[in-house]
Amino acid sequence: MEVAIVAAQRTAIGSFGGGLAKIPAPELGATVIKALLEKTGVKPEDVSEVILGQVLTAGSGQNPARQALIKAGLPVTTPATTLNVVCGSGLRAVHLAAQAILAGDADIVIAGGQESMSLSPHILPGSRDGFRMGNAQLVDTMVNDGLTDAYNAYHMGITAENVAAKYGIGREEQDAFSLQSQQRAAAAQKAGKFRDEIVPVLVPQRKGDPLAFDADEFIKHDASADGLAKLRPAFKKDGTVTAGNASGINDGAAAVLLMSTQKADQLGLKPLAIIKGYALTGCEPEIMGIGPVSATRKALSKAGWTVEDLDLVEANEAFAAQALGVAKELGWGSDKVNVNGGAIALGHPIGASGCRVLVTLLHEMQRRGAKKGLATLCIGGGMGVALAVERP
């Protein structure tokens, strides 16, 4: 038995405090779930389960994936799982969906991720017991739970500085990489390349009809080498990582619909791709950005492929430094990696990004007739995740 992905959709990505800032993550997830069902004609009651990544769940209520399922109109008898594997959540969800199908535990699974970084709350630790005297400090759950290394108590940006130091990757190289990402994303957006993968989100307005949010708003169409060079280091006084060569803080959702190839034939659905290998691996938390190296090698080994066999790659750009470090280790060229720009330009809604890179990969593979593709991400805390797919 093999597992097929028969549909792949995402929302447009919102900037921090931007167009999607008031839309809770489960609503973003529900929008994508509904789109997958409409696209395929699969009946809501035929979905075996839903698995969605979400990292920032504080204040989101019980089991946000289940909320998305209910909001999307699936039966209450359908189970859902919310997954937190930090930046890898949305792709690990696809792994688990494939495993459920291969094990015979599920027929049809929707998997992906959702995130509203804009709505992540601040918390007041210790407040349950009260404060008898002195000041108390609020903790930003977005920074604490999403962007801070739990083992070294420093920001993900420091791990990027560590990778830059390890591989000798300078500021100019990082900025040049980032400019290319922005230019590619801007060109892709102007050419309408993201149109098929994006499902509009209806954003309520104070007056009048809702507005359809249907275009990635984080892309910097006016990005320039001079502009990037003027930015100060964000994490170390003498560092090389800046706001311009790092990914953003964003909102969005993405999901795919999976089933066995036999089930796809039975329903008359043509697979976008067949899953050929996948992996979740670990590395040193201090250099978490190189996680895709071991994950890619393991996934490719399971598929029986080499890096040279790949026609197209979507590798999440958490930071230019880590993306360049991964490229140096794996030896892949920029001609087949993130051809429409990456997270530095598009943004990085952490719980959704794992599936976002897969959705973008699958649509570009269709467009150019690519046969073999790979989606991969680094994961805060020191892990990597990868998925190898092949068009039938």
Swiss-Prot record:
InterPro entries for the chain: Thiolase, Thiolase-like, Thiolase_acyl_enz_int_AS, Thiolase_AS, Thiolase_C, Thiolase_CS, Thiolase_N
Gene Ontology cellular component annotations, sorted alphabetically: cytoplasm
Stored SUPFAM superfamilies: Thiolase-like (SSF53901)
Biological processes, Gene Ontology terms: poly(3-hydroxyalkanoate) biosynthetic process
Positions annotated as active site in the UniProt record: C87, H348, C378
Protein name per Swiss-Prot or TrEMBL: Acetyl-CoA acetyltransferase
EC number in record: 2.3.1.9
Pfam families the record matches: Thiolase_C (PF02803), Thiolase_N (PF00108)
Catalysed reaction, written as an equation: 2 acetyl-CoA = acetoacetyl-CoA + CoA
NCBIfam families: AcCoA-C-Actrans
Protein's UniProt keywords contain Electron transport: no
Gene label: phaA
A molecular function (GO) term: acetyl-CoA C-acetyltransferase activity
Functional description taken from the UniProt entry: Involved in the production of polyhydroxyalkonic acids (PHAs), composed primarily of 3-hydroxybutyric acid (3HB) and 3-hydroxyvaleric acid (3HV).
PROSITE patterns in UniProt: THIOLASE_1, THIOLASE_2, THIOLASE_3
Main location: cytoplasm
Family: Belongs to the thiolase-like superfamily. Thiolase family.
Assigned keywords, A-Z: Acyltransferase, Cytoplasm, PHA biosynthesis, Transferase
Pathway assigned to this chain's UniProt record: Metabolic intermediate biosynthesis; (R)-mevalonate biosynthesis; (R)-mevalonate from acetyl-CoA: step 1/3
Locations listed in the record: Cytoplasm
